């Protein structure tokens, strides 16, 4: 599933070509995704100008305006979705479900597994935060509010393992499986350690590790593990730089210990038995 870095890379790829554009038309081929695409978008969006392309957690937010009427198109890429700019003469593929017709090109949304979201929130940009999908989202890990002190206090009463706790989007948004494993590796913290058994001093190490991991992933274009591609069709390469992710039974790049793979909350976790405690 595309996580914060992949969605941020997507946002940065879309913004230069999309912001300021007037939507010429909308095509809805298969409305039944995780939530049904509102059919009203076909008449609501044409003529709207995209005034900003934002991100909240793993959601893309396209703020639109037409003659003083405002609203936000909320997009989630789901498990396998992607947004690509394509020429008018490129025929749609089997899993191309939704598109915005622009001046000179099309922004096309493909989603083979149909877990994505394309929804509309009327009102000014700030009202998007009131949408049920966004209202319960946690703190942004790249924001100034995300500090060691905040995380220590927020997790003080949580006794579950630290790795699944970091992946709770109601607490912190966008730290997906690969980035939780990599952040804990960089901080030298075992993913098995109870969240409330991590000391305040170690949170002072963990928070910068999370920030650095996410920032490095964004700089690398994200991680293309399965279906994820950029808006221009290119792939991310952070997975090549990973210290522990997908390196089960290989020597640790830091200490030479063995990288182990286990299951936590139904997801694969990778960590070094030698230098993560």
Curated annotation (Swiss-Prot):
UniProt-annotated binding residues for DNA: 95, 113, 158
Disulfide bonds: none
Biological-process GO terms, alphabetical: base-excision repair
Taxonomic superkingdom: Bacteria
Stated family: Belongs to the FPG family.
Listed PANTHER family: FORMAMIDOPYRIMIDINE-DNA GLYCOSYLASE
NCBIfam families, per database record: fpg (TIGR00577), PRK01103.1 (NF002211)
Protein name stated in the entry: Formamidopyrimidine-DNA glycosylase
Species annotation: Dechloromonas aromatica (strain RCB)
Source lineage: Bacteria, Pseudomonadati, Pseudomonadota, Betaproteobacteria, Rhodocyclales
Gene this protein is translated from: mutM
């Amino acid at each position: 599933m595309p996580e914060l870095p992949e969605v941020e890379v997507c946002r940065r790829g879309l913004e230069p070509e999309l912001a300021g554009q007037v939507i010429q038309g909308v095509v809805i081929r298969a409305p039944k995704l995780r939530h049904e695409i509102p059919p009203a978008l076909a008449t609501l969006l044409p003529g709207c100008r995209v005034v900003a392309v934002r991100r909240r957690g793993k959601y893309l937010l396209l703020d639109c305006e037409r003659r003083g009427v405002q609203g936000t198109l909320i997009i989630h890429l789901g498990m396998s979705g992607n947004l690509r700019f394509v020429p008018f003469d490129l025929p749609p593929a089997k899993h191309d479900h939704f598109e915005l017709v622009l001046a000179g090109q099309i922004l096309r949304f493909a989603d083979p597994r149909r877990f994505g979201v394309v929804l509309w929130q009327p009102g000014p940009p700030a009202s998007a935060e009131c949408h049920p999908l966004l209202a319960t989202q946690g703190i942004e890990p790249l924001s100034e509010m995300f500090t060691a002190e905040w995380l220590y206090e927020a997790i003080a009463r949580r006794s579950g393992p630290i790795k699944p706790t970091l992946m709770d989007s109601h607490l912190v948004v966008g730290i997906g499986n690969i980035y939780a494993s990599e952040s804990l590796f960089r901080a030298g913290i075992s993913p098995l350690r109870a969240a409330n058994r991590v000391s305040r001093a170690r949170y002072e190490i963990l928070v910068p590790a999370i920030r650095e991991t996410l920032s490095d992933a964004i700089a690398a274009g994200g991680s293309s593990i399965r279906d994820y591609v950029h808006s221009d069709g290119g792939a991310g390469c952070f997975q090549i730089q990973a210290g522990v992710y997908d390196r089960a039974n290989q020597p640790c790049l830091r200490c030479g210990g063995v990288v182990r793979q286990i299951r936590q909350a139904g997801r694969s976790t990778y960590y070094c038995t030698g230098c993560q405690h």
